[in-house]
Regions:
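Active-site glycine-rich loop that binds ribose-phosphate moieties when present
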Residues: 170-171
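Rossmann-like NAD(P)H-binding beta-loop-alpha module
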Residues: 181-203
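N-terminal FAD-binding dinucleotide-binding subdomain shared by FAD-dependent oxidases/monooxygenases
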Residues: 2-10, 15, 20-160, 175, ...
């Protein structure tokens, strides 16, 4: 490999939920291993720092999405984005991870040397424009699957003629006031499911457009089992028992969706009908064309 480069044992790419978690594990279980984290943005937290749209929250329960080494202690199983971000940064502080993060470092190339048995990773600094290199034995890629630069926006014919604001929820305008406005939300995925109910209290009219329906189920924000266990068990036990309950239920639900998809589909759509009443067109607006096992609810 050409040129000098700082040498470490492990390079972690990304300081979000996965990257911080991996760094904490290295600090705890491999204290003799040196590591650096490349983070392209100016702050840690990844998705939970970038996304600022109203109502942002987890669409998975935090007992399974949180770290096994750091119990989730909040009463909300479906947590707001601010709580998740605080949780990630608390973990980073507890394990002294912050000093290992190189902010505004975007990994742009990686080269393997068979003779040296090491990677050489090049990063570009957004603050100075210079390129820096690190040599490492292992790369732990935690960059996620979102394009942080820009969310996907279809080519809508005539959008340039629209006189109002058009923007992607991923890049929510700071201090946006939508009080009394007429708003159209395009899409009915996880973002829309959290965004629309929150905005509906302040807009004069809110319409959500969807290309095709997705499976939706109503679940309590707080887990009733965890709430009951908190009355007589320590927080760590509550976390572990609730976490395993959630994991086993998800395994059961997945297997049920594979073995008896029609029955599970019938049950979920029945729950929707019960929520909306007999006069709502559930077949048109809430009945997906795909099987349950192909995507999360």
């Amino acid at each position: 490999m050409e040129g000098s480069a700082e040498a470490v044992d492990v390079l972690i790419i990304g300081a979000g939920l996965s990257g911080i978690g991996g760094a904490c594990q290295l600090r705890s279980k491999c204290p003799d291993q040196s590591f650096v984290i490349f983070e392209s943005r100016e702050a840690s937290g990844g998705t939970w720092d970038l996304f600022r749209y109203p109502g942002i929250r987890s669409d998975s329960d935090m007992y399974t999405m949180s770290y096994g080494f750091k119990p989730w202690r909040d009463s909300a199983a479906i947590a707001d984005g601010d709580k998740i971000l605080s949780y990630i940064r608390e973990a980073a502080a507890e394990y002294d991870v912050e000093r290992h993060i190189r902010y505004q470092h975007r990994a742009i190339a990686a080269q393997w040397s068979s003779s040296e048995k090491r990677w050489r990773v090049t990063a570009e600094r957004s603050d100075t424009g210079e390129q820096v290199a690190i040599s490492c034995r292992f790369i732990f890629s935690c960059s996620g699957y979102y394009d942080y630069e820009s969310g996907y926006v279809p080519d809508f014919t005539g959008v340039e003629d629209f006189q109002g604001q058009v923007f992607h929820a991923q890049h929510w305008p700071e201090a946006l006031d939508y009080t009394g406005k007429r708003v159209v939300v395009i899409g009915s995925g996880a973002t829309a499911v959290t965004l629309v109910p929150t905005m509906s209290h302040q807009t004069s009219r809110l319409v959500m457009l969807q290309r095709s329906p997705t499976y939706i189920a109503n679940v309590p924000q707080e887990d009733p089992t965890a709430q009951a266990l908190r009355k007589f068990l320590p927080a760590t036990w509550v976390f572990r028992l609730t976490r395993w309950k959630k994991v086993l239920f998800q395994i059961y639900l997945y297997r049920l969706s594979r073995r008896r998809p029609k029955d599970l589909r019938r049950f979920l759509l029945g729950q929707v009908r019960q929520e909306l009443g007999p006069d709502y067109d559930v077949a048109k607006h809430f009945t997906p064309r795909y099987d349950l096992s192909l995507i999360h609810i």
